[in-house]
Amino acid sequence: MIVMGIESSCDETGVGIVRWNGDGTCELLADEVASSVEEHARYGGVVPEVASRAHLEAIVPTMRRALAVAGIAKPDALAVTIGPGLAGALLVGVAAAKAYAAAWDVPFYAVNHLGGHVSVDTLEHGPMPPCVALLVSGGHTHLLHVEDLAKPIVELGTTVDDAAGEAFDKVARLLGLGFPGGPALDAAAQDGDRNAIPFPRGMTGPRDARHDFSFSGLKTAVARYVESKERAGEVCSVPDIAASFQEAVADVLTMKAVRAARDVGVDTLVLGGGATANSRIRALAEERCADAGLTLRVPKPRLCTDNGVMIASLGAHLIAGGAAPSLLTVASDPGLSVATSQVFS
């Protein structure tokens, strides 16, 4: 069984093609991505209208490239991100997927973007055991309990305000590091002291929700620190600020992820989402998982960011689990809950 996946929830137009191996894994046949990040960089962040127009221009050429790389005329099934994401961006991918599914006369599966970030790990590390997944990106920060990729995912916790990746972008903009902020902050932090500034760790008190996150206070603390230095006529050390901010984010993310794994009784932690490409998040996760006796699974950075392969992979797992196709009348859902792996109608 060969499955094509289409991803258009934000600023990447991704088309991936996989072959289901029948053992809980997929073989990667094609992974084509067209990104509009350079267009958004001019505005300091993702502009929904710009993203939608970029998807319109890129979707068909990207699909054609993926088919050519895979060496096939059409897939056996087609999966698409139905949500969550930007409304206009989702609409482009869903419309294309419906049109091609009808033209090719292949089954159509409307699947969850967040579930794809978990599923894609199986391409690199094999069948997925029961696990806790930490998903971190510009729009999402979630702790998930995954028993089976073909079954509903349980959300253990999420951010109550800013996503971690969003905080990275805002702090990078404050420091004049440009967009996207994650890679820029990570690079700046390499020359800084992560213990230089004691930035706060949000929602880590004894009365706070064990598995939820908050990054707005941290973002504000960085802004106030910079303002205080400027008022005093002192020079800010951008590397120290970047390293200290990055440490505060990584500290909370990894501490709560390990805690969640212990709480639900699993021995595997999976990282996913574009922000998990951050070097400090990965390093601290490795350190804390080793101390806790947990197995850490982290896909290579290309598979952590948005791509069509993750959607094809989730579609393949759902099909193998006996899921019925979605109706072509299904509508995209920008606010789709992570507990809904597939939308049928």
From Swiss-Prot:
This protein's UniProt keywords: Acyltransferase, Cytoplasm, Iron, Metal-binding, Transferase, tRNA processing
Binding, substrate: L135, V136, S137, G138, G139, D169, G182, D186, N278
Localization, UniProt: Cytoplasm
Principal location class: cytoplasm
Gene Ontology cellular component annotations, sorted alphabetically: cytoplasm
GO molecular function, one term: N(6)-L-threonylcarbamoyladenine synthase activity
Chemical reaction(s) catalysed: L-threonylcarbamoyladenylate + adenosine(37) in tRNA = N(6)-L-threonylcarbamoyladenosine(37) in tRNA + AMP + H(+)
Signal peptide span: none
Listed EC numbers: 2.3.1.234
Function: Required for the formation of a threonylcarbamoyl group on adenosine at position 37 (t(6)A37) in tRNAs that read codons beginning with adenine. Is involved in the transfer of the threonylcarbamoyl moiety of threonylcarbamoyl-AMP (TC-AMP) to the N6 group of A37, together with TsaE and TsaB. TsaD likely plays a direct catalytic role in this reaction.
Protein name: tRNA N6-adenosine threonylcarbamoyltransferase
Originating species: Rhodococcus jostii (strain RHA1)
